[in-house]
């Protein structure tokens, strides 16, 4: 039997429809190549710090409470993805980290020694100003991951015109 092209696939998710589509694509690939998946969610602490500085949190000193709520929300959403019928029979390791998403995704790709990153083409923060000044997370991951990156758009029926 030939050696599998991919042994381990990293799938970063922000729970947007596009990232959940990337997870579905990765599950199909995992079945095809008998591959393990690392499912990663990064709590964007840089955004939290900015919200705190701008006074956008209900209580500015409640950043720790907000992080706790975001971790809880992440665990619930990861569980929801893993309990889906399409995830049955695939070996999935879940990881929740804090930091700048593209940095943590690239670090995880290296530390987990993944062969491929499968991620949504765009996520929850797809505002045009953010992209103009900072570039998209997917674009930064393509430049820094150190392995191939497959970006997955929404399926045609889900795309907005």
Predicted feature residues:
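Structural beta-alpha unit
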Residues: 1-4, 80-117, 156-161
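General small-molecule cofactor/ligand-binding pocket signal
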Residues: 38-40, 93-97, 150
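Short, hinge-like loop/turn segments at secondary-structure boundaries
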Residues: 54-58, 111-112, 135-136
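A short acidic, glycine-rich active-site loop
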Residues: 59-76
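Glycine-rich, Arg-bearing micro-motifs that act as flexible, cationic patches
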Residues: 116-140, 158-159
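Short, flexible loop segments at boundaries between secondary-structure elements
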Residues: 147-159
């Amino acid at each position: 039997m030939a050696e599998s092209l991919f042994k381990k696939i990293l799938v970063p998710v922000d729970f947007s429809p596009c990232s959940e589509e990337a997870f579905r694509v990765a599950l199909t690939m995992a079945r095809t190549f008998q591959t393990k998946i690392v499912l990663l969610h990064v709590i964007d602490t840089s955004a939290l710090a900015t919200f705190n500085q701008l006074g956008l949190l209900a209580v500015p000193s409640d950043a720790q409470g907000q992080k706790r709520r975001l971790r809880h929300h992440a665990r619930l959403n990861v569980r929801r993805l893993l309990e889906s019928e399409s995830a049955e029979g695939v070996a999935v390791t879940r990881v929740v980290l804090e930091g700048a998403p593209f940095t943590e995704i690239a670090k995880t790709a290296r530390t987990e020694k993944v062969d491929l990153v499968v991620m949504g083409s765009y996520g929850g923060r797809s505002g045009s100003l953010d992209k103009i000044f900072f570039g998209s997370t997917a674009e930064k991951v393509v430049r820094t991951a150190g392995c191939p990156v497959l970006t997955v758009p929404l399926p045609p029926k889900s795309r907005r015109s």
